Structures are given as C-alpha cells and as structure tokens.
Amino acid sequence: MTLQQLDYIIALDKTRHFVRAAELCGITQPTLSAMIQKLEDELDCKIFDRSRQPIEPTEIGRKIIRQAQVIHYHTNQLHETVQSEKNTLSGTLNLAIIPTIAPYLLPSFIASFRKLYPNIVLKVSELHTTTIIDKLRVAEIDMAILSTPLEDPKILEVPLYYEKFMAYISPNEAIYDRLELSASDMPLDDLWVLEEGHCLRNQVFNFCSEKTHQSSTYEAGSIDTLIKIVDINGGYTIIPELHIELLNEKQKLNLRNIVNPEATREISVVIRHDFVREGVLNAVANCVKKIIPSQMLDPRLKKFAIKL
C-alpha cells in the first residue's frame, strides 16, 4: 500500500469516473485502474462497485476512503509542519464558506489574500454548514468560515466578528412604521425564510422561538431572493448586517433594527484540533478582520449571539 494508491482512490471517489480520475492524478487510465486493483487485492476487498454507472464505493470502500482522506490530510500536515518551522507560508488552502457570508466577504477576501500571500494556492468552496462539518471531519477541507457555536468537540472555533441581524420589511406591512422591532412584533405568518440547510434559517426561528413555526409558501435559496420576494409579494425577512451594502438606497429605507434583545450571530474560522498551520490560520483571520467594520469585531456583542 502506498500514499499514491490512497490518492488514486480519493480521486476516483471524487470523480466517479476512471478517465477523469486519471486526468486529475496526472496518469493514464490503465495505470490508475491497475494501481487501484492492486490495492484491492492487497486488502482482499472491493473498494468500488464497477457494475454501477457512475461507479460507487462499496460499503467497506467508503470506510477505506474516509481513512485514506485522513491519512492524506496528516501527510500534508507533516509537510506543513516543516514549512512552519521555516516561517514560510505556502502550499494549498482548501477553504469553505457558508452562502450567507460569501457574497460580501469573498470578493474582497480573495483579492486581499492573493495579494498578501501569493505563495498559497487558495481554493474556496461555498457550502452549507452540515456539509462543511462533514468535510472538515474527514479532512476534505482545511478550514471554514461560518456561524458558530457548533458545539462539536472535534472542531476548534476561532471567533472573527459579530454581525447583527436586521429586519427587511415591505412598506405594505402594518409594522413598517415602527423604527425598531422586537421578536413579538414580527408575525411568522408574514416571514420569508431560507430553505433547509442554511444555519441562518435556524437562527431566525430560534430568535422567534416563542412562536409556532409556520410553513412558508416559499423558502428561498439566497438572501437576494428573499429580498426580491418581499419587494414584490410583501411580508418581511431577516438579513445579516453586512448584506445592507448590497441593497440600493430605496431598499435601505425598508430596514429596521431588532431590539429586546438584539439579534447577533458569531462568525468564526473553524479548523480540526490537529490543524498545524498556525501561520495560515492567522493569515485568514487577519485578512477577514481587515475587511470587516471595526465595530463588528467587539467581543462584547457575543452575549447577543443566537444559537444555531
């Protein structure tokens, strides 16, 4: 068994296609097939079910691939430990970010990070929280930026900033004339929310925890869609503070502060406990903090944070 063979089964699991996996690994398809077959013979089990199209891992194959991913991660960590001792920031960084942060953070972050750390190859994926946690556990990604706390003992959270929620209300709503709103002012019957899988959806419902959860006519896939729905259909939605910069001047008139209590979410960079690239972690954290308004870095806002 070699590290190369483990890389091959990881690639095949990712692509579910022998030719594409071979291209990903930079070898010929017959070589890839032969090396995977050799590994299966050595382990005396089938890692992939070749009768299916596209091919799929067998039940034991999934377990082997998960272990291969962890071994691959720790091998990279070994190289990174050496680089850390040399005080050089290089290599590849696989970073994930949730969709309700990405639109306003990513454009500036990517530009700034590439300029400051040209020797790091940055790969960014936009994923939901549950997918991020799964990928972090098996070391498919190195770190992520998302809403916390996760309360997962295997994941280390490093808080970056605290973001308030705002109510975005149609001018046709009875509550539109109020300058501030509390949870009791906002009827769930008129609330538009994100679809299942978004942590922001859970936070909105937790904020309105004293009310009965309703079945929305439509659950949107993005905050932009929610805003357009409110503009045309009425009702209201809840949006993160940083999304305000993406609104036009007319839309900004529809915003209201939420009080008693304030609604805030904690945004953190999260890593596995065995992550050794401290320099890269600090690079990401510092880069984000340079983008975020200074008042959102105040840790005293944590007391208003809503649980997921």
How would you describe each model-predicted region?
Residues 105, 171, 254-297:
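A late-sequence structural motif
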Residues 10-28, 52:
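Short helix-boundary/capping micro-motifs
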Residues 176-177, 189-211, 277-286, 291-305:
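Secondary-structure junction motif
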Residues 40-59:
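A short LG(V/I)-centered, amphipathic sequence patch enriched
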Residues 18-23, 30, 37, 133, ...:
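Residues within helix-turn-helix
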Residues 152-191:
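Flexible hinge/capping segments at coil-to-helix
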Residues 90-153, 220-222:
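Central regulatory/effector-binding core of bacterial HTH transcription factors
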Residues 128-141, 146-147, 197-256, 301, ...:
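Hydrophobic hinge/microswitch elements
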